[in-house]
Amino acid sequence: MDPQPGDQAQQPPPPTLTHPRFTLELEFVSSLANPYYLSHLAVNYPNLLGINKSGDDNDTNDSGDPDAQAFAAYLAYLYSYWKTPEYAQFLTHPGATLRALRLLQEDTFRRDIIRPQVIEGLAGTGIENEQGGTEANNPGEAEGEQTKGTADQQDGSSKT
């Protein structure tokens, strides 16, 4: 008997680099480890992340947007199998990728990644330190220090 079309969508693709769906999902989950890609998603596709464009913070329920529900379900599906060793072995940066997928399971994180200070905190301290640390708690200060350090490095390199 042939499998139902819905059943096939629920099963992860076989972990082979020759399977197109596997390589597509591998590329997508790998890109989620990049905080700037998360920012791109938040800015360009806020409806997928349950971000209210009107800026009304009181409306935190994304149940009204079927796109946000579908994307959250897709992220949960991806996390459910990419965290297994059979699939995680193909990730270039498994720690950062799986942490990003885990964080994206949270509604509040999906809504907060539109804020530049959240992205800078992730980029400056790494996703592995999202639970605390001075830079994550005060991202404006960390960003200023980082920019100053970059400018000093550029000045120093142009003098030599």
From Swiss-Prot:
Q: What is this protein called?
A: Mediator of RNA polymerase II transcription subunit 31
Alphabetically, the GO molecular function entries are: transcription coregulator activity
GO process annotations (BP)? regulation of DNA-templated transcription
Q: Where is the composition biased (Polar residues)?
A: 147-160
State the coiled-coil residue ranges.
none
InterPro entries named in the record: Med31_sf (IPR038089), Mediator_Med31 (IPR008831)
Organism source for this protein? Aspergillus terreus (strain NIH 2624 / FGSC A1156)
For whether the record's keyword set contains Flavoprotein, the answer is: no
Gene Ontology CC annotations of this record: mediator complex
Where is the protein localized?
A: Nucleus
User: Taxonomic classification, please?
Assistant: Eukaryota, Fungi, Dikarya, Ascomycota, Pezizomycotina
